[in-house]
């Protein structure tokens, strides 16, 4: 892919990790920092980004219109009012066949218009996801601090490495306030060791963010999770931001 845009694939070993929330938070903060950002949603039949950004009644077109040749990708994208530099290309409401080449053909067609293209992959360990992330510049593996997610994230990461995808980073999501503090550091280290991927961000569990995204309200500026996404966005852009637990 061209150097004019950076393609980031956000994926997880299982559903329920908050992968789409990570995509929305990351896309929002990148856009707020002045980066032209597009999120392409691939959870076919299970789309949710429209709700997260309060656009559930305003999406006129989605990825199926592009795949069918009805319209080009730029025209199918929806602008997000709460962040002027952010656009989303929503997944179809129904299951629709798609190949990795089709997705990257779309990326190639719009790459000069964006600084970052975030691909919200479907969850799960399968060849389709592995093919989709093949040409991404960076893979963000999302896990929560529970044993099932950790094991699945480890299996997924190992398969990425086996396929030659070396550029991976780990995001630990939904970290409860109850365990934020010195006692968590050892547990975080254990998670990193088990998954085998360098940590780039810890996102605290945040009730305000959960409620806002569920209702399609603007992301609350006082949200601790938003501070963590802001720090994560800066790291992805090459800035040095110390990785702390609170506001990670």
Label every model-predicted segment.
Residues 44-46, 94-95, 124, 146-148, ...:
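Conserved nucleotide-binding/hydrolysis micro-motifs of P-loop NTPases
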Residues 89, 110-128:
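Glycine-rich phosphate-binding loop used to anchor ATP phosphates in small-molecule kinases
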Residues 39-112, 211-218:
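P-loop/Walker-type NTP enzyme "switch/lid" segment
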Residues 151-165:
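Conserved C-terminal guanine-recognition region of P-loop GTPase G domains, centered on the G4
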């Amino acid at each position: 892919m061209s150097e004019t845009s950076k393609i980031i694939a956000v994926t997880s070993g299982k559903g329920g990790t908050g992968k789409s929330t990570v995509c929305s938070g990351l896309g929002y903060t990148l856009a707020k920092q002045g980066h032209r950002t597009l999120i392409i949603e691939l959870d076919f039949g299970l789309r949710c980004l429209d709700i997260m950004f309060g656009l559930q009644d305003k999406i006129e077109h989605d990825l199926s219109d592009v795949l069918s040749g009805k319209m080009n990708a730029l025209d199918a994208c929806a602008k997000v009012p709460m962040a002027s530099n952010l656009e989303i290309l929503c997944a179809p409401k129904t299951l629709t066949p798609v190949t990795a080449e089709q997705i990257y053909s779309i990326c190639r067609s719009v790459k000069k218009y964006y600084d970052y293209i975030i691909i919200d992959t479907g969850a799960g360990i399968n060849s389709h996801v592995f093919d989709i992330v093949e040409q991404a510049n960076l893979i963000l593996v999302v896990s929560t601090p529970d044993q099932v997610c950790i094991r699945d994230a480890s299996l997924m990461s190992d398969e990425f490495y086996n396929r030659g995808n070396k550029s991976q980073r780990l995001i630990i999501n939904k970290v409860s306030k109850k365990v934020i503090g010195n006692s968590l550091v050892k547990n975080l280290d254990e998670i990193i060791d088990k998954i085998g991927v360098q940590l780039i961000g810890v996102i605290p569990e945040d009730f305000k963010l959960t409620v806002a995204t569920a209702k399609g309200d603007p992301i609350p500026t006082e949200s601790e999770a938003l501070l963590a996404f802001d720090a994560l966005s800066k790291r992805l852009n090459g800035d040095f931001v110390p990785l702390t637990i609170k506001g990670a």
